[in-house]
Amino acid sequence: MAAILLGFVVYALRLFSLQVLDYASWMDKAEEQRISQLNLPTQRGIIYDRNNVILGRNIPSYNAIIIPADLPDDPGEQQEIFRQLSALIDTPVNLGIIDSATSPFVACKSKHGIAQIAAWAASYKPFTPVPIKCDIDRRTAMRIKERAVDWPGVDVEITPVRDYPTGVFTSNIIGYLGPIYPEIEEEMRGLGFDPSRDKIGYAGIELEYQDLLGGRNGQRVVEVDVGGQVLRDMAAPAAAAPGNNIRLTIDYRLQEAAYAILVDQINFFNARVQTQDAIMTSGVVIAINPQNGEILAMVSYPSYENNRLAQVIPGDYYEQLAADATLPLLNHAVSDQVPVGSVFKIVTGVGALNEAVVTPEQIIKTPGFIQLTEKAYANDPGRPKDFVDWINRDGSHPEGLGQLDFIHGLAFSSNVYFYKLGGGYQDEVPDGLGICRLGAYARALGYATPPEVQLPAVADGLIPDPDWKRLDQGQSWTTGDTYIASVGQGLVTATPLQVLLSAATVSMGGKLMEPSIVHEILDADGNVLETYAPRLRWDLTITPTIPIFDTTSLRDCEPTGELKAIQPWVFEKVREGMRAAVTEGTLGPLSNDAPGFYVLEARGIPAAGKTGTAEYCDIYATAKGRCVPGKWPAHAWTVAFAPYDKPEIAVVAFVYNGSEGASVAAPIVRRVLQTYFEIKAGDADLGR
């Protein structure tokens, strides 16, 4: 009797706990099970080129799905449906076991059989559509629809998937999408995204403009039963807000042509090389309008097929890209930091003229080599070191390039000439520009500062100075470091875009325009919301940007606080030197490019430019044992603009391991310029 009484007491206490003490908790749980929040998918914005060519869009993707609650109750009938569906969509009826710890189900990615997915979904949310196979073709989708009566519980859902019509030609600009990664799931949920389904930008414009392109999902708050079936709306649904569209400054016609020209040139030389070490592996072409900073083309090679990453990111393909030493996922145009070679002589020339290190008419002797005493500090007795001109690299031209004035020193790209301007040389050039002033002019012309272009992962580049070398490498600055930096070698690095900006600034007489790759932001109906106006960083002939250094200070590169501008005539003389490179120098008679820039001259389009051959010794060259003193491998550079009197396009070409700028990079630039003016003429004929 006592035991029975005790049992009643325990029961009464438990009932009291359930009905009174735990009432609120149980009601909260019941409410959570009864009320559900559903996301209404938005439409991602479209990306266009400047002429409305579609570069990124949404297209329908067809997924074969099952709704477990609608499948026949009879297991035999289910199996027959699964068997017939399996034959149509090439997915096994039975495969694997779904286990949240070891083999979880992930829509569109899991390798599980139809029966396993159906059983898992039936125990999870039987009224929720679950993909069996994603991205089936339209014909297969229609056949499934036709069998709707025979296959209850089997259907097709249509979901948007990203499509990139221009593929490899623009993938380094446009980028691609990927799943929301765990670190930002909560943040993205707060913005209305569904981490189980929605994707975000992983690279390029897709990443940089995620907030504008992504839009915002709508929401429905609904009452559901225990199986997940929607019973009713609890409030008026909030409509989805579509993403904004973006119109770029890129002209896809020029972009595609520049890509083809670069690949053609690389393949041409690779077919003729004698050793594997001479293979050219990657390159960049960028074209810009120097008047407003609009980027007309930006090619980074090798590229990748972003359409292969549109539905899911295949592990094998992504691993292949990530393991590739040429880094195809990297936009080399803005992220590569490489030695720039003789294109940097533009900077040294501007600085030397403005600081009166040399006059334009002054004659400088340029033998095949000069011997300098390399010193690390004021009283250092130094060590003799030879500095060789490019024409005497193999010792066959000890006479060098002769006696040169400034115009021809730049046109012929004499190393010895610019060694003397940068570091000084005996009584001929008593006081060289020096590394402090050289760095100041480089920064003024766009080096060592990431350009404000609307792309991710834009690199800084490096203009070294004594403090940097002491802190970073634990070494003192030497006079030899200054000589080498004066010709863009040694520790000087930059991105191809920075090199292009320096030349574009000179072409415009000192106006440095910030580069832009975005022209307009539009709403989903095509109405312009924002137009990106040209942005002048500074006019170097008006805005004082060059620091004046305290020559009495014990510290290196100590500024006085005063700034000065660059005289307009300086840019005109540098322009004349770049023009002479085409008519007399490394882009003309000294070039191996036939017919060369004469093609443009014949059409009444005078051009100006500068070549560069940049020796390098990176981890890849070191691993191959190629960093032999005096025989380092080299990158190829050329930058040019046209027409000379009123520039409307400037182009840079960079070829990794390209050996020589005049032979390899110059023809690329010339052909891109030709293509631009042919497109322009064609548009004029059509009245555009």
Model regions and ranges:
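Membrane-proximal periplasmic segments of bacterial cell-envelope enzymes
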Residues: 1-240, 252, 263-284, 290, ...
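Beta-lactam-recognizing serine transpeptidase/beta-lactamase-like catalytic domain environment
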Residues: 56, 62, 224-237, 241, ...
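Short strand->helix junction
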Residues: 71, 255, 337, 658-659
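Short, charged, low-complexity patches
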Residues: 78, 202, 247, 251, ...
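Short, flexible loop/turn segments with low-complexity composition
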Residues: 682-688
